[in-house]
From Swiss-Prot:
Interacts with KLC1; may link mitochondria to KLC1 and regulate mitochondria localization into neuron projections. Interacts with GLS; the interaction is direct and may control GLS localization, negatively regulating its activity. Interacts with PIN1; upon NGF stimulation. The interaction with PIN1 (via WW domain) and GLS is competitive. The modification Phosphoserine is found at residue 54. Residues 42-53 have a biased composition (Polar residues). Residues 354-372 have a biased composition (Acidic residues). It comes from Rattus norvegicus. Specifically expressed in brain. Detected in cerebellum (at protein level). Residues 1-58, 125-144, 330-372 are annotated as: Disordered. It is found in: Cell projection, Axon; Cell projection, Dendrite; Presynapse; Mitochondrion. Keywords: Cell projection, Cytoplasm, Mitochondrion, Neurogenesis, Phosphoprotein, Synapse, Transport, Ubl conjugation. It comes from the Eukaryota. This is Caytaxin. The keyword Transport applies.
């Protein structure tokens, strides 16, 4: 009796959940005419033989995925619509909390590449100071064993809104031509020392090429060293004629200097001026402004220079110091009174006087004898 009532109750239940006993979906019992208990509808009055009423089977529900419109527009259901842009709270990123790299972190990857360019595909290991390798500061690739790479180190500078490249390998022996001599007065008034004795010899085979790159190096160094007003100390002493810069080179330097640098130049001190440098400046007057000519000052000794500027940080070449010492020695010798070349001792003067008196006495006696 109990089994019959349970069967009647189950007939009144509309079960639309699908049993997930198989991988593929199957039609519902009402569509095929089969009962949900495994028998046909006509055989529903018979008691079930396979249904376990004591235990409950766990049923799984089929989740149907929503229809997705795979398109690039932002219409409803599209991948780009706002319905699919919701993200959990733990995925929200605060931009202010993101750490950005500072200048020191970025420079670790740049190295010297921000201003140096390599030619002929030089390997990176030869350009950087790797641990255990010898330092190659000028990019000539020479190491401790004397070997050299094919590449050269170049520096790119901008002068007068134009980009130029400097061959640092060629001007390496002449880089001491421009040095920083400290500051004078109040503020950042720089002292730029130009030592002409470090200029290349005009008899060099690559003289014009070296002077061209050295000129760019001097101009770019001025722009880096000068912040406010400045003065140039031109050390002309101990410079042979073959190392003197030509008029064309000086003229080019003057015209390539930025207007700000020409305006901020307060004085051009020429130490140990020679007749040649005076002649060059006299010939250059037509293309040099009167204001620039008025800034030129001649100094004939280092002692006089010390009275004009502080000398604590001025690096004087050894040849200039030697030239100054020779000039001081020659000046002291010229200041001494002239001395006679031959001096007779007084002991020898007395016998000569006696002999002259004896001769005079003999002549007098002869005259008296003849008169008698």
């Amino acid at each position: 009796m109990g089994t019959t009532e349970a069967t009647l109750r189950m007939e009144n239940v509309d079960v639309r959940d699908e049993w997930q006993d198989e991988d593929l979906p199957r039609p519902l019992p009402e569509d095929t005419g089969e009962d949900h208990l495994g028998g046909t509808v006509e055989d529903s009055s018979s008691p079930p033989s396979t249904l376990n009423l004591s235990g409950a089977h766990r049923k799984r529900k089929t989740l149907v995925a929503p229809e997705i419109n795979i398109s690039l527009d932002q219409s409803e259901g599209s991948l780009l619509s706002d319905d699919f842009l919701d993200t959990p709270d733990d995925l929200d990123i605060n931009v202010d909390d993101i750490e950005t790299p500072d200048e020191t972190d970025s420079l670790e990857f740049l190295g010297n590449g921000n201003e140096l360019e390599w030619e002929d595909d030089t390997p990176v290991a030869t350009a950087k100071n790797m641990p255990g390798d010898s330092a190659d500061l000028f990019g000539d690739g020479s190491g401790e064993d004397g070997s050299a790479a094919n590449g050269r180190l170049w520096r790119t500078v901008i002068i007068g809104e134009q980009e130029h490249r400097i061959d640092l390998h060629m001007i390496r022996p002449y880089m001491k031509v421009v040095t920083h001599g400290g500051y004078y007065g109040e503020g950042l008034n720089a002292i730029i020392v130009f030592a002409a004795c470090f200029l290349p010899d005009s008899s060099s085979p690559d003289y014009h090429y070296i002077m061209e790159n050295l000129f760019l190096y001097v101009i770019s160094s001025l722009e880096l060293l000068v912040a406010e007003d400045y003065m140039i100390v031109y050390l002309n002493g101990a410079t042979p004629r073959r190392r003197m810069p030509g008029i064309g080179w000086l003229k080019k330097c003057y015209h390539m200097i930025d207007r700000r640098l020409r305006k901020n130049l307060k004085s051009l001190i020429i130490v140990h001026p020679s007749w040649f440098i005076r002649t060059v400046l006299a010939i250059s007057r037509p293309f040099i402004s009167v204001k620039f000519i008025s800034k030129i000052q001649y100094v004939h000794s280092l002692e006089e220079l010390e009275q004009l500027i502080p000398m604590e940080h001025v690096q004087l070449p050894a040849c200039v110091l030697q030239y100054e010492e020779q000039r001081l020695r020659a000046k002291r010798e010229s200041a001494r009174p002239p001395q006679p070349e031959f001096l007779l001792p007084r002991s020898e003067e007395k016998p000569e006087t006696v002999e002259e008196e004896d001769r005079a006495a003999e002549v007098t006696e002869d005259q008296e004898t003849s008169m008698s």
